[in-house]
Amino acid sequence: MAKKSLIEREKKRQRLVRKYRVMREYLKKKEKQVFSLEEKSKIKSKLQSLPRNSAPTRLHRRCVLTGRSRGIYRDFGLCRHIIREKAHACLLPGITKSS
């Protein structure tokens, strides 16, 4: 089980990404459309003034149940350990052992 502080930090990042997504997309589109160097630098400074954690590249996938950050399957949102346990208990429909 991951530390609660790490899980909460990740949730905070997700909230920030959702909050600033529209603004970030707008500034990036505008930067591509503008040709003058001065305006580009102004837009770039506005983009850099946004919170660092509002960038989607700073997000990490975490297991929904345990908070583990590695070995996450996108389809389920679970780590490999939990998927194995749930599959053996027949709690994941459509999952069978390969051998």
UniProtKB/Swiss-Prot annotation:
Stated family: Belongs to the universal ribosomal protein uS14 family.
Name by which UniProt lists this protein: Small ribosomal subunit protein uS14c
Role of this protein: Binds 16S rRNA, required for the assembly of 30S particles.
GO MF entries: rRNA binding; structural constituent of ribosome
Domain of life according to the entry: Eukaryota
Keywords: Chloroplast, Plastid, Ribonucleoprotein, Ribosomal protein, RNA-binding, rRNA-binding
Xref: Gene3D superfamilies: 1.10.287.1480
Compartments where located: Plastid, Chloroplast
Entries under Pfam families matching the protein: Ribosomal_S14
Entry's Gene Ontology BP terms: translation
Self-association and partners: Part of the 30S ribosomal subunit.
Entry GO terms, CC: chloroplast; small ribosomal subunit
